[in-house]
Structure formats: structure tokens, C-alpha cells
């Protein structure tokens, strides 16, 4: 059984129900739907309440930091009490797109880390072109951390491993000349997750199509090859890691 540890069910070409059904048929036993703003997180909590094997997170993407208010933080705190919410995120820093100033992103990130510490929920981290600052801020985190859509070579892997952080590998790890792919054997297998980030980052061999949770099988197959283990072994390993991180009621 596989777990798609990071996806966006409300942005897919098909309904969440259809996406989950297709994923189950492909061998994906659970899906983590990730929130990117308050409204998205509320809808995610509603999905988790009605769809089997779907769990959600509550968070505000750094792209949305420019409009972030104290009321949003209060809303996230309330959502964190919902039974289907298993983590806080995605939150973090993104210096690539520039949708929000670094100052606004840092203020949101600091509040999110504090809220995670208060609620004891793990953090789902978005970091793009901001790894040093991201890691500096995470020094105050007292909860488990997953670096979603992890990108980086030996040095980044070493730092994540030293801190005991989980790393989520998405479809982009399958692309040609991926520095991250070369570093997979250096990663802590007990902190390894596979994800889609659907509808984005479709893995080979479906690159160019809109991504979906079912496609996590391709990323898992690639990662298994890099580690020199069987696909079933990789599936069990990463599903167990997802269960441990998010506290999922899965038999793995």
C-alpha cells in the first residue's frame, strides 16, 4: 500500500471522490490533502470528514502571505482541532515566485511554527530557493517536520537527516539530471515519503499531463530503483513513515 503524502484534491481535473477511487485502484491506500489558505483548509477538513482514507492539513502557502491576518491565524488554530486535520501546512518560504515579500512570508512562517508547537501537529514545509532561511526558522520547531517536494543534494540531505526531518519526494525527482535523485541513497529510509503535489509535478512517464494521486506509483517505482529495493518494500516503508508522522490509523 502506498500513501500520497501531499496532494491537492480540490484542484484536480476530476472530483476528489473520483481521484481517491482511481488512487485506490492503483494501490494508494491513503491520501493527505494539503491546505494552502484558510478556505482551502476548511474544505479539506470537510473532505476528510466524509471521504475514507483521506486526511487533510491546515495551512497558508507562502504565496498567500501578503494577505495574511491575525484572524487567519485564529481560523487555523480552530481548524487544527478538527479530527481530520493531521498536520499544519503547507507553510514556509518561497523566494522563487515573489508573490509575497520575504518579510511577510517570515512573519507568517514564524506564527505557523508557534501554532504547530502549541497544537503538537507536525509541520508540512514548502521551501523554494529559500533553504538556508527555512532551516534557520525551523530551529524553533518542537514538532516533527516534513520538507515537502524536497530538492537538494548531499549537503541538504545531510542537514535534513541530522535534524530528523522527513523528506517528501515528488514527481520532479524523476526528471533528467535531478540532483535530488542522485542523493536518494543518502536519505534516511525511516524518514522518506512519496507524494504527488497533484495537480502539479507529474512524474515520468506521465509528465506533461495534469497530475493525480494515482501517479504516486511512478515516483515510488523510481525511488525504489534508486534504493535498490522492491516496489512493495518501498511502498510499505513509506506508508509506515507516513503513518508515524501523521498519526494515521493504518495497518502497515
Predicted regions, residues:
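Mid-domain alpha/beta scaffold segments of enzyme catalytic cores
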Residues: 1-252
